[in-house]
Amino acid sequence: MATKLIKHGSKAREQMLEGIDILADAVKVTLGPKGRNVLIEQSFGSPKITKDGVTVAKSIELKDKIRNAGAQLLKSAATKAAEVAGDGTTTATVLARALAREGNKLVAAGYNPMDLKRGMDLAVNAVVEEIKKSSKKINSQEEIAQVGTISSNGDKEIGEKIAKAMEEVGKEGVITVEEAKNFSFDVEVVKGMMFDRGYLSPYFVTNSEKMVAELENPFILLFEKKLSNLQPMLPILEAVVQSQRPLLIIAEDVEGEALATLVVNRLRGGLKVAAVKAPGFGDRRKAMMEDIAILTKGELITEDLGMKLENVSIKSLGTAKRVTISKENTVIVDGNGDKKNIEDRVLQIKSQIAETTSDYDKEKLQERLAKLSGGVAVLKVGGATEVEVKERKDRVEDALAATRAAVEEGVVAGGGVTLLHASQPLTKLKVENKDQQAGIEIVIEALKDPLKQIVENAGENGGVVVGKLLEHKDKNYGFNAQDMQYVDMIKAGIIDPAKVVRTALQDATSVASLIITTETLIVDEPSDKAEPMPMRGGMGGMGGMDF
């Protein structure tokens, strides 16, 4: 076991804060309409250029273990904000740094860290209520486009394309993003389906940055029962390997030896495979699997019809242009199903909806109908170079997530204005002691930082702008950093999803609270040994299968 380095008290927190500063300084430059790009070296290929806070944060790893512990904690605030709301990562980073730094100063001055935390939590809960009160629901295509435009750093085309995609498949519809083969940026609606089942093992992931498994032009095996042994599947697996195409297995479950064998072969490169549980339960599961079979022109392998896995040929497998699997969802895009068969299935489900008397059954049938007939909107992002396409694709994905958040919880005035004005009622909060009051004041000061940073990235004095806005009673009055003018933010279309603002603050406070209440830090002591040579990859030919 490696020996440990143990640090206590303010020394530990100070070193952690140094790591937090390093990460926050790299991330904060991306905030606002005049935020700058960050260039990140890749282990292979050309460098990545991004204005996405969480991408910058994820790329940072510090050599010093204690500083790195602080940086990783701050990174978790950005990552959580991205996971929950899809945006607000830079805001979360800026807030967390401000809260942690001010909190640490007070702990060093003798304030009780637990009471500081209680005061901070009181203040944050009050701000969250204020955000909910001031949020405005969005309905029109124009409002949806505004959110998409702001979340993509002012790219109007991205906002308009997202609004168009939502109009095509509905606000709750499935929208995916992929790279185009040309310069254009288009919206295409294709046959497709999404269901709420994710990969059965993280070892199936092909894109570790986004933690998703992406299968291009895969075969799809649909099996009604549980898979616990792969022996009956050997002939079909060998045929798939020979075809050099990926395989998606959808079954009631894949467990034990079968799952372990698939994972081993996926890691060794012999078989590009992923496995997910079938959606639904009981008879509904079977019906949904039949829907997928029709959508992908495959067969549901069911023992009721006397079908056995060992007799299945490649002709019984479904196919699709692409399948994307996350931890929670599977999206099948452009299944190879026959259009007439899909239409017949849709009519069959419609007649079942008309006949059923159960509201629950009707709701579930309508869900199936929406999945089968709604299709998938694909945002195809093009550009002149690979670097440009990847950078724009990242912005489209962020903007799409933020737009979904806006549809869910409404929008508030953007540009850091909502957080700034939400700090004003905090002075009236009742507390038990002066330490809790100090916790509230930490939050009041930190809420000014996102707006200050946006203004400073635009080349103006943040403190002066904050002072001017606090004198104004209109909560929507703010500073348009793009045009360098004071405006009504809502009327000017400068809006943020309420969910993004709320999540950024809650995640930042959670991380800052952890830092100020940390008294002891234990990390591995730096090793004097030279780092081992990296293992060389290599997997030739079709061999190496381990069934």
Curated annotation (Swiss-Prot):
This protein's UniProt keywords: ATP-binding, Chaperone, Cytoplasm, Isomerase, Nucleotide-binding
Xref: PROSITE patterns: CHAPERONINS_CPN60
Family from the record: Belongs to the chaperonin (HSP60) family.
Location of region: Disordered: 527-547
Compartments it resides in: Cytoplasm
Name of the protein in its database record: Chaperonin GroEL
An example Gene Ontology biological process: protein refolding
